[in-house]
């Protein structure tokens, strides 16, 4: 039996008359690199907020790391990490101070915290920058530090929301190598991105359109399902369809 870190059944979220997510059925395995894709307004952000335990679903169920997002939201939040495209760093703090702060927020203290951070710093190559203020780091190093902060507590699941926006191609490539290292260690990675070359690096993808799940599978399976030539073609197709739907 697969070890599902995320499992949703008929998950639905309504804001007044607007249904943002319609009956989402989704499973994501431990150690999987999973892409959640779709045009703006497709329901990605609402889905992530529900899975983080920040927004309650209107109906349906979901578990993250074995805990119900409605009844065990606090336990869910202790087992996830989240990194936004702005990285969530404190510019006036040093690299080491940012790491210690986030580790403490996630409940790591004392020797356990220092041992975990030492291991993490070595893995992400941050040793030489521990005393540098975060605000003076380049985009690529901020990205690396943001990931280190989001995963300092060794979460079961980490959400990466447009993590490589505004970062040069070399830094993006290095970042994806780090993502796969995390996955090999058992951390499930859920990525949202508008870079379709990055989407094709995911092991599986889910496409949302106007709150509906319309495709799940490997990049090759998604391309075949939509009769397209690439994942980018699928994205453009859905974007145009959504724009036409809104216009009509």
Predicted regions and their residues:
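Conserved ABC ATPase "signature" region
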Residues: 100, 104, 109-129
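ABC ATPase "signature
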Residues: 216-217
């Amino acid at each position: 039996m697969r070890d599902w870190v995320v499992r949703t059944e008929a998950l639905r979220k309504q804001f007044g008359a607007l249904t943002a997510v319609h009956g989402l059925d989704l499973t994501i395995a431990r150690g999987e690199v999973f892409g959640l894709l779709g045009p703006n307004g497709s329901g990605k952000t609402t889905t992530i907020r529900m899975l983080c335990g920040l927004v309650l679903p209107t109906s349906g169920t979901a578990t993250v790391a074995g805990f119900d997002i409605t009844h065990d939201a606090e336990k869910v939040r202790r087992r996830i990490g989240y990194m936004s495209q702005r990285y969530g760093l404190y510019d006036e703090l040093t690299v080491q101070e940012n790491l210690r702060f986030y580790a403490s927020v996630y409940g790591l203290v004392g020797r356990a915290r220092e041992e975990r951070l030492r291991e993490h710093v070595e893995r992400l190559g941050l040793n030489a920058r521990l005393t540098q203020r975060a605000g003076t780091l380049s985009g690529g190093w901020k990205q690396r530090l943001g990931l280190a902060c989001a995963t300092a507590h060794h979460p079961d699941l980490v959400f990466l929301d447009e993590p490589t926006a505004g970062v040069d191609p070399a830094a993006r490539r290095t970042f994806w190598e780090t993502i796969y290292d995390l996955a090999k260690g058992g951390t499930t990675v859920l990525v949202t991105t508008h870079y379709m070359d990055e989407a094709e690096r995911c092991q599986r993808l889910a496409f949302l359109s106007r709150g509906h799940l319309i495709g799940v599978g490997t990049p090759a399976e998604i391309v075949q399902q939509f009769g397209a030539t690439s994942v980018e073609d699928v994205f453009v197709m859905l974007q145009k369809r959504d724009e036409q739907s809104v216009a009509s």
